[in-house]
UniProtKB/Swiss-Prot annotation:
Ranges where the record places region Disordered: 172-212
Quaternary structure, from the entry: Homodimerizes.
Gene that produces this protein: C
Biased segments, Basic residues type: 178-205
Keyword terms: Disulfide bond, Host nucleus, Host-virus interaction, Repeat, Secreted, Signal, Viral immunoevasion
Protein name as catalogued: External core antigen
Residues making up the signal peptide according to the UniProt record: 1-19
Protein task: May regulate immune response to the intracellular capsid in acting as a T-cell tolerogen, by having an immunoregulatory effect which prevents destruction of infected cells by cytotoxic T-cells. This immune regulation may predispose to chronicity during perinatal infections and prevent severe liver injury during adult infections.
Organism this protein belongs to: Hepatitis B virus genotype D (isolate Germany/1-91/1991) (HBV-D)
InterPro entries: Hepatitis_B_virus_capsid_N (IPR013195), Hepatitis_core (IPR002006), Viral_capsid_core_dom_sf_HBV (IPR036459)
Presence of the UniProt keyword Secreted in the record: yes
Positions of region (3 X 8 AA repeats of S-P-R-R-R-R-S-Q): 184-206
GO cellular component: extracellular region; host cell; host cell cytoplasm; host cell nucleus; T=4 icosahedral viral capsid
Single GO biological process annotation from the record: microtubule-dependent intracellular transport of viral material towards nucleus
């Protein structure tokens, strides 16, 4: 979708990004959230500040260092691996397009508009997307969702009523494990004691006493 925005700007059929978005909405009429199938939303990630996310270069290096074999494998590993593959390929195509624009677009103002849009708007979206899937593969999806919810609650709480430090993703698994281990076992309601039948030995001793 973002690549098509750029194509519309370059071809001047829609002179602004806002106009291209209107055209896309008219053509497709779809509201696609890439995080919904993973239990998150774009709005949930928007609670994290922009400078929270590492650069695309750092995220790509992290993905390559941790998951290179799985990403290059022809087999399906997980939905997160598939999403990472697509994001990495899209970013590569975007860089190719940006290079072409920088070399061929004559109007300096239009060139600056495209470069700024790529670096700020699209760069942030790719940083969010890469961070989310790398974190889910590293810490687990449930932990990442719990972190996003916790951070969203923290950032929306007035400063006077919230802890001084924001939640930290790397400490959530440990906290979760401690909380699970600290659960008190369920108490079972004691059942009424059944009257035990006398054992044969007890009955034999009683019969002997009666005989005596």
């Amino acid at each position: 979708m973002q690549l098509f925005h750029l194509c519309l700007i370059i071809s001047c059929s829609c002179p602004t990004v806002q106009a291209s978005k209107l055209c896309l909405g008219w053509l497709w009429d779809m509201d696609i959230d890439p995080y919904k199938e993973f239990g998150a939303t774009v709005q949930l990630l928007s609670f994290l500040p922009h400078d929270f996310f590492p650069s695309v270069r750092d995220l790509l290096d992290t993905a390559s260092a941790l998951f290179r074999d799985a990403l290059e494998s022809p087999e399906h590993c997980s939905p997160h691996h598939t999403a990472l593959r697509q994001a990495i390929l899209c970013w590569g195509e975007l860089m190719t397009l940006a290079t072409w624009v920088g070399a061929n677009l004559q109007d300096p103002a239009s060139r600056e508009l495209v470069v700024t849009y790529v670096n700020i708007n699209m760069g942030l979206k790719f940083r969010q997307l890469l961070w989310f899937h790398i974190s889910c593969l590293t810490f687990g999806r449930e932990t990442v969702i719990e972190y996003l919810v916790s951070f969203g609650v923290w950032i929306r709480t007035p400063q006077a009523y919230r802890p001084p430090n924001a939640p930290i993703l790397s400490t959530l698994p440990e906290t979760t494990v401690v909380r699970r281990r600290g659960r008190s076992p369920r108490r079972r309601t004691p059942s009424p004691r059944r009257r035990r039948s006398q054992s044969p030995r007890r009955r034999r001793s009683q019969s002997r006493e009666s005989q005596c």
